[in-house]
């Protein structure tokens, strides 16, 4: 599996799953652009890529802004080339029970986690169509399929992500562009490490494999979907959740 010569764009790449994806695509030979919402985050991405021998850059991108998406893509195209692999990973949470949820908690999550797919995917399709090759990979969540109390906004956005993935896959398949999603379960991150022991044990009790996933395990699936080995896979949502949810 080689991505040599391909330019890959990974949003939300300063830590966790996004960082692991950026490093995996770089390991496979891609030139990687990772984005963050702040200059310090973009600098961290650039340093991480360099430290791991990956060619690429860290850039500031607000996926909720049409202007930011347009400016960032123009910069990438001018300096690094057309991104033919795009990983929509950036996302936020604003958890609350629906009865208490404020409008901005709903709309911020939907705008960042779902509307951003529309903005970024639409913006890169022309270049992929011209190249007659492309990979769009959307990072969803097990919550999009099974739901989670206090996360109606997040669950709705992630469920929408899966529908978007399937519909777009049907639109662009004839151009050798594949569109897939990866739906992680609970992953070992700073947030899950801070859970109280009792809560952590209860969580592990729901997972047949009896452990949290690693960000690198998500990244390996993304690396496969980005490769020519997955050229006949499109419109799929790949669950990586340790068996927590089976469909």
UniProtKB/Swiss-Prot annotation:
Binding site for NADP(+): 12-15, 37, 62-63, 89, 154-158, 187
Active-site residue list: 154 (proton acceptor)
GO function term, MF aspect, one: 3-oxoacyl-[acyl-carrier-protein] reductase (NADPH) activity
Top EC class of this enzyme: oxidoreductase
This enzyme's EC code(s): 1.1.1.100
Function per UniProt: Catalyzes the NADPH-dependent reduction of beta-ketoacyl-ACP substrates to beta-hydroxyacyl-ACP products, the first reductive step in the elongation cycle of fatty acid biosynthesis.
Family that this chain belongs to: Belongs to the short-chain dehydrogenases/reductases (SDR) family.
Protein's recorded name: 3-oxoacyl-[acyl-carrier-protein] reductase FabG
Organism (species): Pseudomonas aeruginosa (strain ATCC 15692 / DSM 22644 / CIP 104116 / JCM 14847 / LMG 12228 / 1C / PRS 101 / PAO1)
Gene (name only): fabG
């Amino acid at each position: 599996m080689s991505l040599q010569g391909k330019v890959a764009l990974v949003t939300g790449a300063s830590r966790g799953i996004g960082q692991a994806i950026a490093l995996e695509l770089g390991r496979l030979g891609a030139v990687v652009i990772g984005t963050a919402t702040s200059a310090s985050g973009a600098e961290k991405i650039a340093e991480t890529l360099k430290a791991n021998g990956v060619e690429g850059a860290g850039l500031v991108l607000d996926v909720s802004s049409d202007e930011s998406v347009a400016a960032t893509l123009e910069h990438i195209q001018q300096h690094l080339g057309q991104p033919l692999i795009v990983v929509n990973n950036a996302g936020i949470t604003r958890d609350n029970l629906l009865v208490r949820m404020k409008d901005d908690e709903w709309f911020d999550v939907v705008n960042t986690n779902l509307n951003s797919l529309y903005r970024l995917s639409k913006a890169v399709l022309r270049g992929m169509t011209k190249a007659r090759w492309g990979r769009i990979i959307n990072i969803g969540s097990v919550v999009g399929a099974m739901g989670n109390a206090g996360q109606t906004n997040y669950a709705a956005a992630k469920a929408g992500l899966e529908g978007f993935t399937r519909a777009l896959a049907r639109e662009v398949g004839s151009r050798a562009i594949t569109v897939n999603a990866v739906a992680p379960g609970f992953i070992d991150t700073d947030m899950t490490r801070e859970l109280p022991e009792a809560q952590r044990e209860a969580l592990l009790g729901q997972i047949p494999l009896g452990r949290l996933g690693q960000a690198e395990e998500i990244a390996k699936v993304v690396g496969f979907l980005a490769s020519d080995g997955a050229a006949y896979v499109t419109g799929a949502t790949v669950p990586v959740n340790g068996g927590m949810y089976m469909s």
